[in-house]
Amino acid sequence: MNKTFEKLGFYPADILLPKDQDMTKWAVVACDQFTSEPEYWQAVEEKVGKAPSTLRLILPEANLKAPNVDEYISGINAAMEQYLKDGVFRTLEDSLIYVERQQSDGRIRHGLIGMVDLDAYDFTPGSGALIRATEGTVLDRIPPRAKVRRHAPIELPHVMLLVDDPDKTVIEPLTAAADTMEKLYDFDLMQNGGHIRGYKLSDKQVDAVAKALEGLA
């Protein structure tokens, strides 16, 4: 791995991707969405059925206060173990993925999937940590999240980092090169979620990202 990443708090990661699955059923929105709309999650449940899905690997915040939340968490950990045992995943070692997510309104959001150094993160207001929160943290949501992770063999984090890059040095070169990159996935998202594509960065592109981020640090 490029040593430059060590001072950035953001790294390439070993990323798990499902093999030979219905990707529309596999991918669901982040657990902190539609918290007051249980009907949305019920529709997702009906869409997924018995297919392998990240729905089985997350705890939607709509269920945080459910009376059977401990049972729900045990089911999540069991599903993780079963998916690993069944060989559901393939591993992209030490990788970054460039993502283009087309929203239902046609707008495209661009991003980069990697790994965040949580030791460099602090959600305390006014913190000077390398990685800081952009909004307030709801403390009572932490315990059930921690409980899911306590026995979890894999991670499904929902962390979004914002980068101030006025000269467009990090993402835009990847957008321009997308047609030449290895495409990892390309599918419609359920529930009118739009469309998503993912591309694996080459070693040269990973090094370029490290250099660009170092220039912004």
List each model region and its residues.
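N-terminal extension/subdomain marker
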Residues: M1-D188
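Glycine- and acidic
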Residues: G128-R132, H195, L213-E214
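A sequence-level detector for short glycine-anchored, His/Arg-bearing signature motifs
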Residues: R149, K204-A217
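Glycine-rich phosphate-binding "P-loop"
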Residues: D179-D207
